[in-house]
Amino acid sequence: MNRPVLWGAPPAERADAARNRVHLLSTARDMLGEQGPDRLTMDALAERAGLGKGTVFRRFGTRAGIFRALLDDDEHTFQQDVLSGPPPLGPGAAPLERLVAFGRARADFLIDHREIARAALDGSQPIPAGRRTPMSQVHIRMLLGQLSPRPGGLDLDMLTIQLAAALDGPVLLYLSSDELTDAVDSHERRIGQAWQDLVERVCRP
């Protein structure tokens, strides 16, 4: 696996449904910025957006579905940066440089989206669930396969799972807001540096 992978393009939707989706997500973001996640409910979103409750329910299913949709929307932007943005996150840098940059950017993304990620939990799933193989797993496996020389004696498939867990695991998702209030930059730097230390040691030939 050594080519960029597109992580599941969304299915085609009717023009009116697409307009409603964009409007609802924009409205939800406005409400988040003004009131925080606790006040963002299905009923409140329907009222603020000027749409019927049935429309909101069909679009999101549950309150957690609103936050999953917000997370998915931002994930898509992040994926585009990985696939076609400037190096070292995007193409054009050496695989190890891209792996380091990806982990740093991914950790920043998860910390920045910690409130949305927690609100996306619906009680029946341990972490926000997706319909596809986690993007971190796909991308990390691709970059590991491009390393030259390759690390000797390693199971790249299992290493991929371990490295992806270091980024997408519950430790990052459950970092408390109180813990991060005055130290977000410090956490991002420390997690990013720890990721770089890890992959540089593991990927050493």
Question: Model features per residue range: what roles?
Answer:
Residues 32, 67-74, 113, 117-120:
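Alpha-helical DNA-contacting segments of helix-turn-helix folds
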Residues 82-90, 114-124, 170, 174-178:
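Secondary-structure edge/capping motif, primarily at the C-terminal ends of alpha-helices
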Residues 1-35, 39-48, 65:
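Basic, helix-initiating cap at the start of DNA-binding domains
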Residues 27-31, 69, 109, 166:
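Short amphipathic alpha-helical elements of helix-turn-helix/winged-helix folds
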Residues 1-8, 138-153, 160-162, 166-205:
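C-terminal peripheral helix-coil segments that are non-catalytic and often amphipathic
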Residues 79, 101, 105-112, 121-150, ...:
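Amphipathic alpha-helical packing segments from all-alpha helical-bundle domains
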Residues 72-99:
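Amphipathic alpha-helical linker/stalk segments
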Residues 50-60:
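Short hydrophobic/aromatic patch on the recognition helix
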